[in-house]
Every structure is written in C-alpha cells, then in structure tokens.
Swiss-Prot record:
The gene is ppk. An intermediate of this reaction is the autophosphorylated ppk in which a phosphate is covalently linked to a histidine residue through a N-P bond. Keywords: ATP-binding, Kinase, Magnesium, Metal-binding, Nucleotide-binding, Phosphoprotein, Transferase. Coiled coil: none annotated. Its EC number is 2.7.4.1. GO terms for molecular function: ATP binding; metal ion binding; polyphosphate kinase activity. It catalyses: [phosphate](n) + ATP = [phosphate](n+1) + ADP. Belongs to the polyphosphate kinase 1 (PPK1) family. It is an enzyme of class 2 (transferase). This is Polyphosphate kinase. It comes from Pseudomonas aeruginosa (strain ATCC 15692 / DSM 22644 / CIP 104116 / JCM 14847 / LMG 12228 / 1C / PRS 101 / PAO1). GO terms for cellular component: membrane; polyphosphate kinase complex. ATP binds at residues 45, 468, 564, 592. The active site is at 435 (phosphohistidine intermediate). Pfam families: PP_kinase, PP_kinase_C, PP_kinase_C_1, PP_kinase_N.
Amino acid sequence: MDDSSLYIHRELSQLQFNIRVLEQALDESYPLLERLKFLLIFSSNLDEFFEIRIAGLKKQITFAREQAGADGLLPHQALARISELVHEQVSRQYRILNETLLPELAKHQIRFIRRRHWTLKIKTWVRRFFRDEIAPIITPIGLDPTHPFPLLVNKSLNFIVELEGMDAFGRDSGLAIIPAPRLLPRIIRLPEDVGGEGDNYVFLSSMIHAHADDLFPGMKVKGCYQFRLTRNADLSVDTEDVEDLARALRGELFSRRYGDAVRLEVVDTCPQNLTNYLLKQFGLSESELYKVSGPVNLTRLFSVTGLESHPELQYPPFTPAIPRLLQKKENLFNVLSKLDVLLMHPFESFTPVIDLLRQAAKDPNVLAIKQTLYRSGANSEIVDALVEAARNGKEVTAVIELRARFDEESNLQLASRLQQAGAVVIYGVVGFKTHAKMMLILRREDGELRRYAHLGTGNYHAGNARLYTDYSLLTADVALCEDLHKLFNQLIGMGKTLRMKKLLHAPFTLKKNLLEMINREAAQAALGQPAHIMAKVNSLTDPKVIRALYKASQAGVRIDLVVRGMCCLRPGIPGVSHNIHVRSIIGRFLEHSRIYYFLNGGDEKLYLSSADWMERNLDMRVETCFPVEGKKLVQRVKKELETYLTDNTQAWVLQADGSYQRLSPTGNQNPRNTQATLLEKLAAPVLTAR
C-alpha cells in the first residue's frame, strides 16, 4: 500500500475540484447570474490556493525542505504540473467570461461597457466622476532612486504606467505605479440617463486607463496596464513560543498583507519588458505570471450576482422549514427533554439552534452555557445571545478558535466583545485548532441539574447555514451531554483524556475508532458476510485512512464515498480499490456535512462529525464525531446519504487516473438532483422519543 501510484497529489486534486466549480459556469440549467457566481468562486478559490497551498510548496523549496507525500511528487515537481494546469484553466475562465457570460448578460441588459464603446455622454460623466471621486484618493508613485518600488498589498489592484518626458524637477524615470485603494469600487454603475436602460457598468480600471494623463500633468502616458500580486497569506505564529496568542496574531495579521510573492497577474496587453520588470521586482519566474484578457480581480464582481432588478436570473428564494413541533413556540427545553431534534440545513432552518441559545440567555433556570466558535460571521445572533446571557448573569464560557483561516480578525473582535460582556473566553489548545461545533447548556429543573446540547457538522454561522449543507442535533441525551461536559473541561482546564461513553473526539479517539470500524467491515467481508461503508466528507487525504479503505476493498467491502473536494484515493484500481466508488456533488449549496456509515454486521452505525478524513483534522484538531441513534433517525440520514449516491445531474465520478466524469441521465433515467430533491421534500425533521 506504499506504492505512490495508488495516491493522487493533494494540490492537484484540489485544483480538480476548482475545475468542477468552473464547469458550472457553462451549465445552462443554472440561472445566468448564478453561473457568473460560479466563475467568480473559481477566482476566489484560486486566490486562497495560491495564498496558502502554493505558498507552502514554495516555502519548502526555499528552505530546501522538500518532502514528497504518499503520491511521491516533490514540491518542485508538483509546482510544474500545477502551473501548467492553472494557466490552462485561467485562460479558459476568461474565455467563458468574455465569449459566453458577458454576451448573455448583455441580452438581459446587464452590460460592462468597455472604453472603446463609451459614448460622448459616458465619457463626460466618467471624467467628472474620476475628477471628483477617484483622483483625490489615488496616489501615483513615480519610480526613481528616491521613490523605490512600493510595497504593494496582497491582491490589490495596481497599474504600471510607462511615461515619456520630464517632470517639474527634471526627473525622467519613465515608469510609475498607481495603487488603487481597496475602498474604491471596482465597478461603477452608470446612471440610467447616461448609460441607458438596464444595468450598465464601467470598470474602475477603465476609468484609470482613460485618465492616467491627469495624474501625470505635462507628461505623455505611453501605456497603462493593470496588475495584481498574490502573496503568502498563511500566518506563522509559533503557538509554542508566545505568551499571548491574541497579541501575536494581531501582529501577524498586518504582516499577512505583505508576505512573499507567489503569483503575478497582468492584463494581456502589457508589454514583455514591463512584465519582466515586475517579475524581477517580485522575485517571480515566468511560470508564475498569468496574463488575462480582462480585469485582474474578478472576485470584485460578486456585487452584480445579487442584482435586485433581475431575480429571474438568480435561484428562486426559499424558506427553510421549521419543524412542526417547534412552530408552536413551546419552550425548547420542554421539547428536548422528550425528543432529539435533527435538522438538515439549509433545507431546514438554523433558527431553532439560535432560539435555544436565546431562550437559555433569558431563562432564570439556566446557570451556565459553554460554546465553541470557529466561524460565526458579522452581526452574529449566536454571539448576541451569548453576550445577553453573560449580562444576565449566566456563567458563559466561549472557546474561540483565533486561528480560523481568514476569520482571525473577526474572531479577535468577538472575543473582546464577549470578554467585555463578562464571558470567560478561551483560545483553545496550543498546537491544536478547535474545529468542533458544540454547545452545552446547564439548567436547574426540579431541584436537579440537567444538560442540553447542540452538536453540528457546520459552523455557528447563520449565513453559512443558508448556503452550506450541514446537520444539527439538539439533544438532552444524558450520556452525550456528559461526554460534552468532559470535553469542554478538557479544553478549558487541564487533565488527562477521560473515557467517553458515546462521543468520539480528535485528536484522541476519533481516528483510532474510525480505523477500527473500517477494519471491522473488512473482517465481516473476509468471512463472507455483507459489508458496506458509506461516507460523505469534504476531503479525503489521510494516508492511513486511505490504506485502510484499500484493504477493506480488497477484502470485498463495498465502499461508497461522496467527497466534495480533495480526494487522494484512486478508486477502481483492479485488485486494490475495485470496490470503491467516489463521487463529488457540486450544486447550488456547498456540500459541507460529514456522515460516516458502517453496516456493522446488520447493527448499523451512523455518525455525524465536524471532521474530514484528513491528517490535520484527525491528528491536529479538536473535532467531534457523534452517533445518530434511534432507528427512525438512522434510516432518515441513511436515506439522505443514499440520495447523494443516486444523483445523476450534479455528480462527478472520480476515475482511477484522477480525472472526474460528470454524470447525466441515460436512456430512460429520470434526472435526479439531490439538492433539489431535498429542498422540495425535506419539510420537517424526524423526531425520536427517548
């Protein structure tokens, strides 16, 4: 099982996922603005890929610490393959934008008007807007010995300008840089009396190109070309060597804007001598240069995808269901004392989770609340309820993961807010990210203390709960709540790992038990008994888990996997993974739930988890994995998982060579769209009595 040909390179697999995202932009079954959104998500994903993954590979090379993964590729070999693939896909992305999406948008009177098509009225309006709103904010920088090349912010829009002539001081540098401040909009909507009927926009870059002369009076502008630099954005706080993690992170957040260069994007009209000059300034090679036929910062077009004037070009709105029993506005503690409630977001509302916390904040019988927070978003109702609870005298403890990537700053702010309200704030465990999603409420009832809990596969983020598929379990199960109590004490205090009755948790018992359950299925198959594993995760990269799955496949276990993103396992290899089937679902909602199912000799075991099957999750994070109990709930989740395995419109099947093949209905097959089916049919949760 150590043969490198049995494994797919992690970063190459991640790129394959992003290619599947880009493919959605060509899918005419989606509304037009949603197709544009997929194209922009491709850009956003690629930005993070370069900021984190490419930066990490380059760092290994720089410090001569190249290490091959299970696939055998060294970082410099992987970078060569990645560069070739990304160049190909970025060119394709701009072709889709320019040749397909923009013409289609224009048919619906959504236009991005290029300079060559500006009317006199538009030119006049743009000149006035540039003079009043843009020029006062822009600071052009001439390049000479007293004006060295500026330190440019990560992913900022900039222009390199070729000049001719001498300025008032007799300087003749020939080059200047125009940084475009982030506060400036990248697209500007024209008034209807200027642009005409519909939604008409001009690019900020076009405005600056048109009026660059105004920024260098008396000099001739020979050329003005936009470019964008991507930098290493991974934080490098040594958690073992800092006394105050919050203070150390604040310092690193500023440094992140100016990390090492990893990619240069320039408009394709930029002359070779100028691109060479920029590459030299940033210490980049030709393979790290991306010439694009359009704006270099496509992610700033996201504002257009939610146009109120064109609801017909967007997904139809929907209202997540509220369980009928919970619609009665009954005290949630009374409900949960009798029943477990399982919710599948976004098809079912996240509101009951928020309501439980709100009721706890106001309830005089509630004594304490403990909560983990990884990503919560701006204006979080969850955080509002925790603040209210603390102000009402409850013992509120929040375990906040300050190192949640790209949410560090907002998490620092909410930590301060909770501390000011009187809550106890803990920053997790040194060396281990707290990724678990759990809430525990302690309430006095009839002279006794009783616990209530929420466990989830997704974040306490109401916005994500409308866009991501996730599960929530609301419960008063005594054993599960006792396990959570132990885990919170372990996070907040000190002590050895305590034995859990039901909960599996990383980095202690989850991986060990996961491997044991896989091996148990293999043992069943070896005895000629039925054996089946089904799982749905975001990523599968852990070599130990992959090897266990290979051995189970060899023993005869049928293994059905739904892996949205990275998958380093190769299915369909004769004699190794011929019993393993892997598919990825890409659709309206981001697939985010983690489900593990084992036939277990007929005594079915089904778990929900916050953890993907990755080394970082199973070995280096605090994660939870909790059982779904009760025949009705088990069958419900099992059927929902099986729905993903029958999808033939949003499913992409992984081939042994690492490529993906999109499924479509064949013959007399009816189209089966998992997300549409769940959206239509999932009206209320199944409740199970205890």
